[in-house]
From Swiss-Prot:
Effect of inactivating the gene: Not essential, the disruption mutant is super-sensitive to azide, export of some proteins is decreased and has a small colony growth phenotype on rich agar medium. It cannot replace secA1.
Name of the molecule in the record: Protein translocase subunit SecA 2
GO BP term (any one): protein targeting
Entry-linked Pfam families: P-loop_SecA, SecA_DEAD, SecA_PP_bind, SecA_SW
PANTHER family on file: CHLOROPLAST PROTEIN-TRANSPORTING ATPASE, SECA INNER MEMBRANE COMPONENT OF SEC PROTEIN SECRETION SYSTEM
Gene for this chain: secA2
NCBIfam families, per the entry: SecA2_Mycobac
Annotated source species: Mycolicibacterium smegmatis (strain ATCC 700084 / mc(2)155) (Mycobacterium smegmatis)
Molecular function (Gene Ontology), one example: protein-exporting ATPase activity
Reaction equation(s) it catalyzes: ATP + H2O + cellular proteinSide 1 = ADP + phosphate + cellular proteinSide 2
Upper classification of the organism: Bacteria, Bacillati, Actinomycetota, Actinomycetes, Mycobacteriales
Subunit structure: Monomer and homodimer. Part of the essential Sec protein translocation apparatus which comprises SecA, SecYEG and auxiliary proteins SecDF. Other proteins may also be involved.
Keyword Translocase attached: yes
Record keyword Metal-binding present: no
Length: 784
């Protein structure tokens, strides 16, 4: 249940910190003493001119950050440089946050407390110690904004800074990665890693070896999007799903031909439904060996598209295209697709021409991408609530940073209603009442459909509201920045504009401005939530929009017994239904309503953690297999292993080619062998990924034969991978033996080794309906 006010945290036991995955108080106390010690050097730093300040920074000994004697001097120099270059003088709590990130923690800092500056100081500390730092953001807009904003500070400390966005060329990316500090979105860093797995010459590599990852909005990247696969795809001639099957499935009746579970996460054919589909398809047997992995899979995918995926909730249709909605950010995800057939099935369902799926050349989850870095740290407004996941999956601790000014936001108890309709009516009435006073209101909705419905009702009620749910990041930031203006009413999905402060009175209003004072007198920003999320952390992110840097503010959440989090996790028969008959608004008056909401949310959080853990075990298998492929590929790319192996396997062919190629035969043969070996390794990995995707789509059917789907998936995946190495080397030897000599470079005809004519990158949507429960065990040393 939300507290009525937020205050500065008191002393908590070391055991409590550990339970939350937080650093112990002893470490916090040491960092605090170092921050206080920086005051002894502030006058010396202030007396230095700009050139001397840069030299002083470069002379610091920060290689061993844990025991660095110069850390207090670094803090003083960084504070002085920040004030000179950005006009912002870091508070003690910002320096404390930087120190805890330098210790390898994720810090929790309230909205408006200056995470961007604290992160830049931490990045500078790592870079001055000789580390290469990637500051990882949730989108391109923030990557470029923060690099340009914090760039002068980093340059004043003698460091180089770069940024990468989707528009950056390969040369621009290489240049940015060569900088001491590089700002980039998690997507772009991941896509660069994937694209590097296609190069056949070391000179074409873009992404450097990972060193330090400093993650902004760490809970969003490390938890909400941890299991989202980033994908590199290439042109192929794979068959598209049959439109007639998708049309037939659309004619089936709920409850008669198919059933869904209580949470609407899964759908399956009934016996009657199976008979209908078999008849429509010419009397086939869906469960025969011929159709169980093909036709039945297509039907199941079409069922998911028709029944479980809802327009304006999971996706929108715009400009004759299906655009997915990112569940954790509540906004359009332009780079995301559903895997293979599901994307095409939704497009066919909406009467849109199906887009080319291509074949997956390589893939990596966000979690596996981040785990490549030897050092990971980060910052967010809601880290403690994600402490268990951060500890379990990344071995990260959490450091809560006290606010510079105590938080005086007032969080009202939930208002609970019997029906969703009654709840929406109450929300509109409440917003209209608050709007009459001029107090700005920010409304957080769960999806696009809800935000548009609420916006329409507000307009009918005479409330001029702005709806924000599907614009680009820069436009989102501009609109959100004005949500604190006098009389503003902004309806927004959960994550829209995250990373942008909401200043009372508007973005261009100073602290002493009359309009800011007027808004503060009215109570500051008022946040309205249209229902509990599946995790309290997301609720707190929304609440945290109000009460910035000691400003007044308030929040209230409206819920109903029909909300997803309640309907999926509480028995309706046990819910209190008492309402005030005089009010007639459907509001529940039972005192235990709020505690029931808390319980439903805790159950939801537990299930999400279980899904994350189970899916993580499945993804670990692919990550381990991919690591073996990457290691093998690096060896082939950077050494003469390919030439030596083919020379050993085909000595006569090698000798003949060496004679034909003349003086520079060894150099040319090294290139020829490398191209052949890399091609067949990449081809084998691509086909292996396609095999894994195929067995995943039908692995649950193993349960019909009383087999454990998880064990079966593991067995099949490991068996297939074990033969990948031998098959790739054998295919390479065959190509080497049969390739004809030519006069042109490289000396033999390799035209049959054609790579995709075009490639593209995308994210596989973090499907809220998925419930993967795969496992991973040890892998054989297939290339050893």
């Amino acid at each position: 249940m939300p507290k009525t006010s937020s205050a500065k945290p008191g002393r908590l036991s070391s055991k409590f910190w550990k339970l939350l995955g937080a650093s112990t108080e002893r470490n916090q106390a040491r960092s605090l003493s170092e921050v206080k010690g920086a005051a002894d050097f502030e006058k010396k730093a202030a007396d230095l001119d700009d050139e001397q300040l840069t030299k002083a920074a470069k002379l610091l000994k920060l290689e061993d950050l844990a025991g660095a004697s110069d850390i207090t001097q670094f803090l003083a120099i960084a504070r002085e440089a920040a004030e000179r270059t950005t006009g912002l003088r870091p508070f003690d709590v910002q320096l404390l946050a930087a120190l805890r990130m330098l210790a390898g923690d994720v810090v929790e800092m309230a909205t408006g407390e200056g995470k961007t500056l604290a992160g830049a100081i931490a990045a500078a500390g790592y870079a001055l110690g000789g580390r290469r730092v990637h500051v990882i953001t949730i989108n391109d807009y923030l990557a470029r904004r923060d690099a340009e904003w914090m760039g002068p500070l980093l340059k004043a400390l003698g460091l180089t800074v770069g940024w990468i966005t989707a528009d950056s060329t390969a040369d621009e990316r290489r240049e940015a990665y060569q900088c001491d500090v590089t700002y980039a979105s998690v997507n772009e860093i991941g896509f660069d890693v994937l694209r590097d797995q296609l190069v056949t010459d070391v000179a074409d590599l873009v992404s450097p070896n990972p060193d330090v990852a400093l993650i902004d909005e760490a809970d969003s990247v490390l938890v909400d999007e941890a299991l989202v696969p980033l994908v590199l795809a290439g042109t192929s001639h794979r068959e598209q799903p049959r439109v007639e099957i998708i049309r037939m499935v659309g004619e089936l009746e709920a409850g008669k031909h198919y059933d869904t579970d209580a949470e609407s996460r899964n759908v399956h054919l009934t016996e009657a439904g199976a008979r209908v589909m078999e008849a429509k398809l010419g009397g086939i047997d869906l469960y025969s060996e011929e159709h169980v992995g093909t036709t039945l899979t297509e039907i199941n995918v079409a069922l998911h598209a028709h029944v479980l995926l809802q327009r304006d909730v999971h996706y929108i249709v715009r400009d004759d295209a299906v655009h997915l909605i990112n569940a954790s950010r509540g906004r359009i995800a332009s780079l995301q697709r559903w895997p293979d057939g599901l994307q095409a099935a939704v497009e066919a369902k909406e009467g849109i021409e199906t887009t080319e799926t291509g074949e997956v050349l390589d893939t990596i989850t966000v979690q596996a991408l981040i785990n490549r870095y030897p050092r990971v740290c980060g910052m967010t407004g809601t880290a403690l609530a994600a402490g268990e996941q951060l500890r379990q999956f990344y071995k990260l601790g959490v450091s809560p940073i006290p606010p510079n000014t105590p938080n005086i936001r007032k969080d009202e108890p939930d208002r609970v209603y019997i029906t969703a309709a009654a709840k929406i009516d109450a929300i509109v009435e409440h917003i209209a009442e608050v709007h009459k006073t001029g107090q700005p209101v920010l409304v957080g909705t769960h999806d696009v459909a809800e935000s548009e419905e609420l916006h329409e009702k507000l307009l009918k009620a005479g409330v001029p509201a702005v709806v924000l749910n599907a614009k680009n990041d820069a436009e989102e930031a501009a609109v959100i920045a004005e949500a604190g203006k006098l009389g503003a009413v902004t309806v927004s999905t959960q994550m829209a504009g995250r990373g942008t402060d909401i200043r009372l009175g508007g973005s261009d209003v100073g602290d002493d401005d009359a309009e800011k004072k007027k808004v503060a007198e009215l109570g500051g920003l008022h946040v309205v939530g249209t229902g509990r999320h599946h995790t309290e952390r997301l609720d707190n992110q929304l609440r945290g929009r109000a009460g910035r840097q000691g400003d007044p503010g308030s929040s209230v959440f409206f819920s109903s017994w029909e909300d997803d989090v309640v309907a999926a996790h509480l028995e309706r028969s046990k819910l209190p239904m008492e309402t005030d008959p005089d009010a007639g608004d459907g509001r529940i008056i039972a005192p235990r309503a709020a505690s029931l909401l808390d319980h439903a949310q805790r159950v939801a959080e537990g299930r999400l953690l279980d899904v994350h853990a189970n899916t993580w075990r499945y993804n670990q298998l692919i990550a381990q297999q991919r690591a073996i492929i990457v290691e093998r590929r690096e060896t082939l790319l950077r050494t003469d292993t390919a030439r030596e192996e083919l020379k050993e396997r085909s000595p006569e062919r090698y000798a003949k080619l060496a004679e034909e190629l003349g003086e520079d035969a060894e150099e040319r043969l090294e290139k020829i062998c490398r191209l052949i070996m890399l091609y067949h390794l990449d081809r084998g990995w691509c086909e292996h990924l396609a095999f894994l995707a195929d067995i995943r789509e039908s692995i649950h059917l193993r349960a019909l034969g009383r087999q454990n789907p998880l064990d079966e998936f593991h067995r099949m995946a490991v068996d297939a991978f074990a033969s990948l190495a031998a098959d790739a080397i054998e295919a390479a030897q065959q190509t080497f033996e049969t390739a004809e000599s030519v006069a042109d470079e490289p000396g033999v005809d390799l035209s049959k080794l054609a790579r995709p004519t075009s490639t593209w990158t995308y994210m596989v949507h973090d499907n809220p309906l998925a419930d993967d429960t795969m496992s991973a065990l040890s892998l054989p040393g297939v290339f050893r």
